[in-house]
Amino acid sequence: MTTSGKENFRLKSYKNKSLNPDEMRRRREEEGLQLRKQKREEQLFKRRNVATAEEEAEEEVMSDGGFHEAQMNNMEMTSSAVITSDMIEMIFSNSPEQQLSATQKFRKLLSKEPNPPIDEVISTPGVVARFVEFLKRKENCTLQFEAAWVLTNIASGNSLQTRIVIQAGAVPIFIELLSSEFEDVQEQAVWALGNIAGDSTMCRDYVLDCNILPPLLQLLSKQNRITMTRNAVWALSNLCRGKNPPPDFAKVSPCLSVLSWLLFVNDTDVLADACWALSYLSDGPNDKIQAVIDAGVCRRLVELLMHNDYKVVSPALRAVGNIVTGDDIQTQVILNCSALQSLLHLLSSPKESIKKEACWTISNITAGNRAQIQTVIDAHIFPALINILQTAEFRTRKEAAWAITNATSGGSAEQIKYLVELGCIKPLCDLLTVMDSKIVQVALSGLENILRLGEQESKRSGAGINPYCALIEEAYGLDKIEFLQSHENQEIYQKAFDLIEHYFGTEDEDSSIAPQVDLSQQQYIFQQCEAPMEGFQL
């Protein structure tokens, strides 16, 4: 994750060997993966083109009371009556007028909210293939457009429904239509391709293998109407999305130069999807991060952290956070863009997910070198982190704990003392009773780093007393560490025992505290302790 020289330096300089550099600088794991699987409010992977208000009014204002009657008819209509024999007959006729009329009827059916009859349409023999055939009618752009709209809405359905469109051979034709002379046809084609690519990594890779990127980037490079640009950059973000497996970077990286100027388009939707695309491209090993940095997007991404719409802030923050999972040099690029002031601002966001993501980003900066930890100190970020550690939701507190423990692991004596003076000990002690084993370990590591410094200071001064032991006891930390000796996690109970033995032991220590050893099982046997009064906290 870092260059070999850097890694050797880090391994020597980190006082806490239980959190190695790879662990400290964390890629998005566990919770992040779950977040990615969810359909975020800010981002839709599939979209249906619905009928306009004018068209619906046109259809529904019939005779006296026609609007109410149409509503009742829609509610009562059975699936068997949705597609009439006339529609099927017309679509297979040789008359262009009848073909267009029938295609429009299908399109209106599939544009209805909330449950379009996609299954009825795809189960009608030959209909999907007929619409794909209509895509080829260059002499009739209206028919092309209507057929593309129908197929877009079929592809907005579930994976099986999307696969029907792929199997009918629509994708290569849609890619050809990106170069159509007619903007409406181009836009509908890009919408369809975005839906198909957004279905799954398999569909995404198939669309990429059909060589969508050159014509899509060509389309984006033109001065288009804004709806076209929105659809195209949304489709592009779907082509970059996905982790298992990620897209072939060689196939998607050519879009970086286009994304770099899309970040300056004055449209919230375009900015949001461009940032999502960059967040996907930067989510990976350092060579991918470097390609994103080389595209020159970092300064603009940092600027967008202060955008007034969370729809933009969220993916911009995700991209910035991914970049600082790289090595120290890559992290420094973000720091050189004055990111810390923006991150400090985001730590007070009313949106919890933004606070959490900002803490995660900072935790990867504090996993850097001492100069980088100092820039975080100079930006007055740690007081806000300690406040979060005491008051925020648990998922956010976890990230703040990583940020503080990372700083105690790689920081200098002065930097660690600064954190102690800010009051980091009590909130770290409070984390010792949570149910999340990993965070208990993180808190223990932070406290161990502080205790180790206290021991060094006491030896240097000749006082013989570790000043931080008393602070931990005052925060009820010792009681909690003692309780952890009966923890089910072996690393936790071993660490708890070691801390007590090394830093809190006395010559007349009660021998009953020390665990017995089960030689047959190669493990310690701990006596059951009563839980502290406050119990486990989440």
From Swiss-Prot:
One of its GO terms (biological process) is postsynapse to nucleus signaling pathway. Residues 149-241 are annotated as: NLS binding site (major). It is found in: Cytoplasm; Nucleus. Residues 245-437 are annotated as: Binding to RAG1. InterPro entries: ARM-like, ARM-type_fold, Arm_3, Armadillo, Importin-a_IBB, Importin-a_IBB_sf, Importin_alpha. Pfam families: Arm, Arm_3, IBB. Coiled coil: none annotated. ARM repeats lie at residues 77-117, 118-161, 162-206, 207-245, 246-290, 291-330, 331-372, 373-412, 413-457, 460-504. It comes from the Eukaryota. Residues 1-38 are annotated as: Disordered. Residues 20-38 have a biased composition (Basic and acidic residues). Keywords: Cytoplasm, Nucleus, Protein transport, Repeat, Transport. A motif (Nuclear localization signal) lies at residues 42-51. Residues 318-406 are annotated as: NLS binding site (minor). One of its GO terms (cellular component) is nucleoplasm. GO terms for molecular function: nuclear import signal receptor activity; nuclear localization sequence binding. Essential for selective protein import into nucleus. Promotes signal-dependent binding of karyophilic proteins to the nuclear envelope. Forms a complex with importin subunit beta-1. Belongs to the importin alpha family. This is Importin subunit alpha-5. It comes from Gallus gallus (Chicken). The lineage of its organism: Eukaryota, Metazoa, Chordata, Craniata, Vertebrata.
